[in-house]
């Protein structure tokens, strides 16, 4: 039999059948059976589901081996379970749907289900790992040649069953899993299937063991615009500047949480966001609602009954039409060569702090702040840049050297501390023609980084002297703070002011220039923005942690007036970063994919309904809409007018004069 798809890894994307195909997928339990799928097998019900999936354009299914239905305490696998799995894979094959198998389940939908051969507390112990790999080996050997198989996934959120006590304990399990799979099956991709703040999803640490990273993102935010942007920012974080392919392995909401209409708008926004941020696919949670509402865990987790794109009676929710339209459109976009003939060219990278993905003695910020708070400055910096029209990636601090030849600007946002070696590398990078923007923070609310120095190269790199009073926790900013520009900066003229509201106390450094220029001061005429020439490049030093201030840790709603974005656009202008396509509204995210004679441009409205104009530095020859639910109303040689409903997107093929 010919395989449904052959999925392989090439640098930052997964190749499907030798080319790029976006893996539009769903997570799956049967509508009529839910988690009882394997125990209460109903082939007719499953065929009905998969046939409907195919009609909607679904290309991939992530499904789950509920271990207690497959094996006993001695890891002896039930023959009838294997036959059911084979039949399920046959049904997928008949419908040309690719299967990604989650092997250790484990956790599912608000309940931890029994793993027969091990206690939860023993999951990472050698005896338990040996038994687990015996199970994995048996399943993989049995089905590695089945044409419906596309990939093997360790678990479903194993860290919710038992989190590794430390990074090495968790990675030991993943290493053995990867080695076991690859020793049997080198033809299919491998991933971990864990939660985003797990050790098993840390790209810098797992990239040698998995073929893609698959974050599970269920994000919440008072700011709907920031919420939409955050999905793309998280994909960039996990990509680590193209180190590894990324599939958005789980995302969604229950229509018992939100209306079906808003649910559909959300999925539309995220699908185009995933495509715009180089994701290799996106798997919606989940295919259908379930009819057995009193089954565990639905009895106490009613939201879990309603995540589907299909209702429990089999009728389609509005989101199903979104999925069907996206499936058709993405085929046309792929034919043009997105990701292969047309590629992004980001010239900026935002740096993730060293302590997020590696432990250092007495550096406890990841533990104190937690994963989500630790990454907020990075996420917001990515959002501010993207909403300023500046394409950018995210890169881990220990990997920054790989960006030195491809990025014109590196951004180190709201920095508590960076490695001494990082500062030295930055100096060398700038002297050779790169550019650096860095902002600092010493404290927020009750958090203080007291016994800390962000850098040792204040004068050598930034051209400033740190003049903070001995013993001070930092200069406090609270309430309305004005940034007054003493000199021109890109699009900002001397005398311009930008006000920022700071509702929570923020503590930072005070400095004076040594051989740098003071670009801006605060309300009290204290310098807050400096510019220093170092060799062939420039260093921009901001003493206000404006990225952290715009995070949901500090403010319920970001400032979407565009004035903060203007700072980044001005720096981008000064350092020669190309912004070929832009719009005045920061609520619109624009991601261009450049070709030799034309471009693909994806625009996503993360806000309310609006009419916008995208301007181009190129002379436009022809505009063709190839995707999305926004409407192109007119275009000229330099501008495109678009009517963009709330949470809508548009994909354009832009031909220009050569």
Annotated model-derived regions:
Residues 414, 418-658:
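A conserved amphipathic helix/loop scaffold
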């Amino acid at each position: 039999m010919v395989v449904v798809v052959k999925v392989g890894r090439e640098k930052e994307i997964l190749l499907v059948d030798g080319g790029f195909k976006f893996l539009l997928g769903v997570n799956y339990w049967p509508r009529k059976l839910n988690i009882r799928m394997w125990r209460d097998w109903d082939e007719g019900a499953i065929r009905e589901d998969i046939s409907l999936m195919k009609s909607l354009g679904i290309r991939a299914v992530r499904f789950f081996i509920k271990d207690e239905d497959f094996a006993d305490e001695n890891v002896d696998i039930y023959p009838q379970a294997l036959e059911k799995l084979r039949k399920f894979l046959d049904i997928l094959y008949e419908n040309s749907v690719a299967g990604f198998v989650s092997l250790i389940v484990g956790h599912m939908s608000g309940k931890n289900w029994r793993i027969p051969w091990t206690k939860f507390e023993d999951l990472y112990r050698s005896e338990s790992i040996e038994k687990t790999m015996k199970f994995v080996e048996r399943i993989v050997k049995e089905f590695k040649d089945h044409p419906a198989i596309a990939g093997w996934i360790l678990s479903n959120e194993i860290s919710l069953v038992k989190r590794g006590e430390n990074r090495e304990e968790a990675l030991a399990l993943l290493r053995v899993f990867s080695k076991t799979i690859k020793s049997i099956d080198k033809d299919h991709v491998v991933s971990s299937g864990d939660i985003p703040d797990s050790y098993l999803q840390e790209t810098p640490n797992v990239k040698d063991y998995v073929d893609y990273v698959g974050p599970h993102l269920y994000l919440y935010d008072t700011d709907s615009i920031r919420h939409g942007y955050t999905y793309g920012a998280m994909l960039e974080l996990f990509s680590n500047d193209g180190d590894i392919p990324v599939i958005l392995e789980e995302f969604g909401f229950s229509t018992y949480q939100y209306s079906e209409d808003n649910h559909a708008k959300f999925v539309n926004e995220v699908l185009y966001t995933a495509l715009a941020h180089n994701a290799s696919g996106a798997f919606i949670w989940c295919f259908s609602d379930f009819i057995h509402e009193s089954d565990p865990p639905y009895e106490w987790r009613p939201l879990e009954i309603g995540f589907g794109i299909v209702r429990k009676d089999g009728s389609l929710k509005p989101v199903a039409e979104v999925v069907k339209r996206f499936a058709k459109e993405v085929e046309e976009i792929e034919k043009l060569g997105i990701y292969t003939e047309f590629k992004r060219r980001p010239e900026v990278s935002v740096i993730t702090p060293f302590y997020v993905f590696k432990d250092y003695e007495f550096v406890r910020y990841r533990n104190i702040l937690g994963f989500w708070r630790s990454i907020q400055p990075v996420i917001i910096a990515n959002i501010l840049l993207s909403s300023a029209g500046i394409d950018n990636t995210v890169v881990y601090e220990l990997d920054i050297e790989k960006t030195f030849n491809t990025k014109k600007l590196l951004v180190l946002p709201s920095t508590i501390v960076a490695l001494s070696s990082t500062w030295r590398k930055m100096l060398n990078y700038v002297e050779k023609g790169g550019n650096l923007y860095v902002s600092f923070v010493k404290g927020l609310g009750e958090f203080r980084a007291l016994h800390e120095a962000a850098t040792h190269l204040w004068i050598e790199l930034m051209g400033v002297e740190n003049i903070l009073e001995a013993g001070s926790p930092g200069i406090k900013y609270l309430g309305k703070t004005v940034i007054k520009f003493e000199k021109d900066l890109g699009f900002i003229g001397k005398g311009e002011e930008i006000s920022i509201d700071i509702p929570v106390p923020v503590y930072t450094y005070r400095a004076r220039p040594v051989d740098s220029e003071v670009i801006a001061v605060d309300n009290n005429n204290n310098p807050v923005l400096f510019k220093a020439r170092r060799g062939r490049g420039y260093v921009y030093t901001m003493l206000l942690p404006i990225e952290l201030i715009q995070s949901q840790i500090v403010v319920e709603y970001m400032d979407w007036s565009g004035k903060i974005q203007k700072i980044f656009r001005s720096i981008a202008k000064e350092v020669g970063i190309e912004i070929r396509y832009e719009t005045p509204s920061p609520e619109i995210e624009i991601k261009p994919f450049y070709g030799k004679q034309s471009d693909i441009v994806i625009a996503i409205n993360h806000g309310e309904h609006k009419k916008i104009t995208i301007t181009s530095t190129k002379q436009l020859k022809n505009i063709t809409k190839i995707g999305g639910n926004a409407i192109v109303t007119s275009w000229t040689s330099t501008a495109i007018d678009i009517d963009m409903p709330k949470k809508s997107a548009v994909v354009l093929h832009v031909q220009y004069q050569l």
